[in-house]
């Protein structure tokens, strides 16, 4: 639903049992020319390989925290598709804040960056940062992101 509100032509719920069929039906069984994996979770990384079309571009943005292993079947899938696999540097630039942060702020300020308030689950003052991080200890307990706000600079936001 969020992807559709932000302008996607179609969206597939990967928690549904038949999501692979639904996803492939959208491309008439061809697969996707561009696949961006942003979670960094092994299941979604494998899913990216499965959903990619022949000669596709697969980009990993998420950072995995477990080893990835490939079954012979998955390896064969990757080999036969001959896709391009690249990684993308996230938002760790130096000197801070870096060009990507400046561009993001510009596009947000000018309305060129589409944004949905549901992306932010909760706003907390910076003084409660430890509490915010603790909420993420239980997988799935936070839907969206927690925005930490510098309360002395933006007292009206928190």
Language model features: what each stretch is:
Residues 52-70, 84-85:
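ADP-ribose/adenylate-binding Rossmann-like module
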Residues 20-24, 68-120, 131:
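C-terminal substrate-binding/catalytic core of Rossmann-like NAD(P)-dependent dehydrogenases/reductases
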Residues 1-47:
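Adenosine-nucleotide cofactor-binding segment
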Residues 1, 68-70, 155-157:
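Short, charged/polar "capping" segments at the starts of alpha-helices
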Residues 14-18, 39-40, 96, 121-128:
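Short beta->alpha linker loops
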Residues 46-50, 54, 99-158:
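C-terminal hydrophobic helical "lid"/dimerization subdomain
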Residues 6-7, 54, 81:
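Short, structured coil segments at secondary-structure junctions
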Residues 39-40, 62-63, 89:
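Short glycine-/small-residue-rich Rossmann-like dinucleotide-binding loops
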